[in-house]
Amino acid sequence: MPKTFHRTDRVSAQLRRELGTLVHNAVREHGLPSVSVSDVEITRDMAHAKVFVTALMPERSAEAVAGLKELGYRLRMDLARAMKLRHVPELHFHYDDSVDRGEHIDNILRDLPDTLAAEKRRESDEE
């Protein structure tokens, strides 16, 4: 059975594409820390959109999100010009920490063989 696509899914994908370009330009123009749009979730009534961004430097993510929140109105107006929507949703920017969590898990898994080898050595020394 084919998957049904709702209008909100299509609008969300289009918002993600457009915002990716707009956010990239805003970062360059306003000297914000480098971020990229990772996902956009839009409400069913299309009045609000959660925009998830990832930062190249996670330690400056709060600064980047705060800067984007300040530019939210301008970005919304730019979206209105770029998209053919009757009502452009209000933008709410959030930091997406999934990349950071994935990197943390990757580091744990990478260190696992060393940890297991050290534990085996400790067990053999005790015997």
UniProtKB/Swiss-Prot annotation:
Localisation per UniProt entry: Cytoplasm
Species name: Stenotrophomonas maltophilia (strain K279a)
Name of encoding gene: rbfA
The protein, known as: Ribosome-binding factor A
Family from the record: Belongs to the RbfA family.
Subunit and interaction comment: Monomer. Binds 30S ribosomal subunits, but not 50S ribosomal subunits or 70S ribosomes.
Role of this protein: One of several proteins that assist in the late maturation steps of the functional core of the 30S ribosomal subunit. Associates with free 30S ribosomal subunits (but not with 30S subunits that are part of 70S ribosomes or polysomes). Required for efficient processing of 16S rRNA. May interact with the 5'-terminal helix region of 16S rRNA.
Gene Ontology BP annotations: maturation of SSU-rRNA
Keyword Membrane belongs to the record: no
Coiled coil ranges: none
GO-annotated cellular components: cytosol
